[in-house]
């Protein structure tokens, strides 16, 4: 057997494993031209430090970790209890899940649609995320105040039974 029989399939596979710069960009979004190496100025210039912000520093990290840790017991409560959970717990679970999802999608936008590369598209994505989170908050309010709540709605989907509305 010749070695060319084995090398041809490997060459085809190798093409999928190479990393090209264009494979790390979003093709339909306009990009800002970048300087070589992404460095502005000369080697002797000091780097740009963004202004300090309480919303973006360690407080942001603490809130993110707190929401992530709060999700675990709040999801376990409806699984452990057989009856309905309190309205406060249901609302708190809904809001914690909304905050957790908002921060997670915000991190994805910051990582993959960076302001340095995509410019205003980054801001549009953040505005759309904020709008979606606000509309979700309104939906949570409606679900908790006029319907049976998040957990009861999920249980009705699971059991395939209609949900009874809250009495006012």
From Swiss-Prot:
GO MF term (any one): metal ion binding
Listed Gene3D superfamilies: Fumarate reductase/succinate dehydrogenase, transmembrane subunit
Gene label: SHH4
PANTHER family: MITOCHONDRIAL INNER MEMBRANE PROTEIN SHH4-RELATED (PTHR13337:SF5), SUCCINATE DEHYDROGENASE (PTHR13337)
Residue intervals passing through the bilayer: 66-86, 93-113, 121-141
Binding site for a ubiquinone: 112
Entry similarity comment: Belongs to the CybS family.
Lineage: Eukaryota, Fungi, Dikarya, Ascomycota, Saccharomycotina
Protein name per its UniProtKB record: Mitochondrial inner membrane protein SHH4
Subunit description: Interacts with SDH3.
Compartments where found: Mitochondrion inner membrane
FT transit peptide: 1-23
Residues that, per the record, bind heme: 101
């Amino acid at each position: 057997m010749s070695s060319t029989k084995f090398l041809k399939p490997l060459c085809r596979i190798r093409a999928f494993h190479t990393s090209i710069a264009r494979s790390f960009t979003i093709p339909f979004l306009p990009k800002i031209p970048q300087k070589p190496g992404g460095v502005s100025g000369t080697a002797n210039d000091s780097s740009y430090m963004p202004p300090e912000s309480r919303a973006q520093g360690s407080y942001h990290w603490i809130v993110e970790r707190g929401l992530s840790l709060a999700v675990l017991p709040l999801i376990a409560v409806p699984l452990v209890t057989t009856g309905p959970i309190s309205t406060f717990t249901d609302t708190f679970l809904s809001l914690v899940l909304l905050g957790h999802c908002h921060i997670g999608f915000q991190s994805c936008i910051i990582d993959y649609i960076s302001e340095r590369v995509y410019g205003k598209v980054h801001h549009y994505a953040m505005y759309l995320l904020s709008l979606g989170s606000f509309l979700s908050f309104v939906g949570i309010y409606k679900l908790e105040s006029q319907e049976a709540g998040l957990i009861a709605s999920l249980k009705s989907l699971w059991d395939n039974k209609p949900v009874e509305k809250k009495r006012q």
